[in-house]
Amino acid sequence: NQHNDNRLYGKTLMNINEDLIIKNKSYYTSGSLGFNYVFNDKHSVGATYEVNINPYSRGGWNSLMDVWKNGSQTESYTNDMYCRFKSRPTQDITAYYAGQIGKVSIEWNGEIYLRKTGQTQYSEETGMEGGDSRTIESDFTADSWMHASKLVLSFPVWKGTLKIGNEFTESCRANLYTIDEQGTDLPGKTDDQVKESNLAAFVSYGLRLNKVELNAGLRYEHVSSNYYNTGGDYWSEENKDYFVPDQSRKYDHFFPNVSLTFPIGNMKMNMVYKVTVSRPSYSQLSSNVQYNSRYYYQGGNPLLKSTFEHGIGINLGYKWFQFFANWRYLVDPCY
């Protein structure tokens, strides 16, 4: 059971009190197949295939909602929501190679990920004491794919190890949301796609001199995220007409990181500085607005930007005593 008490401020002060009984029931099945082959002590390869599917998944809630405007109750109704999740598979293929040629160590990883999700939702609203009633049916499907590759070369330089490498990731997600009724108080149909490519190159160096450890690295990323509002085939030539530049993004950034560990008497000091990025998920970027009840919609925001974080950390240790201090600075935070 769940109770929600929400207050909305505007021209009208609105209070929405809701009591929920939530029910869910799902069955999942999965399978995997893989192999690993060692040629010799310097070369090995392997791959795995995994599939997941939910043959049965149902959910929903029963709720009683009371609505108050400027201190007076204006509406009371029940909402019986039933959701049937579509039985669509998720597939994941991964492969790797690990080897050594001379003094150079080679690590390669690749992945192909395919996912299909969807649900059909029924919302039956019944007004109390002669209030209006209605039944809303909506349908949502999402198809996504991703393929990625990462290569790292490691070899000794002076008294440490130098690593250089690159990564490439390309992904796409297509969303389709339809609702059986249209009106000024109902969301409309949405059909959008987001395609993103990420090309990265990085270098790092780590060494140990007596009791001092130093690790430093630099990563460069070129990210292109294109947003399309379309009902057509993404790969068709006509699809360029549906490109939305205001909701698309391009990034070119460097991400440095430095870590230094050294003793101070009987204590051990570690200092870290790094820059990281957190990008919105596909669901957060979707323009789809899902209808849950006449007062609750759920959706994303295609205008969200990536959040960049600059962080400094200090760790001081002495026997069982540990002291931590962290400083963070966020650029374009998303909460």
List each model region and its residues.
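Acidic/polar loop patches that form or flank catalytic/metal-binding clefts of enzymes
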Residues: 267-272, 323
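Outer-membrane beta-barrel translocator domains and adjoining extracellular loop/strand segments
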Residues: 2-12, 58-74, 118-128, 174-183, ...
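Periplasmic-side early beta-strands and strand-to-turn transitions of outer-membrane beta-barrels
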Residues: 1-39, 53-70
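Outer-membrane beta-barrel signature, preferentially recognizing the C-terminal barrel domain
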Residues: 84, 190-198, 246-249, 277-331
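Extracellular loop and loop/strand-boundary signature of outer-membrane beta-barrel proteins
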Residues: 14-21, 77-83, 131-139, 183-191, ...
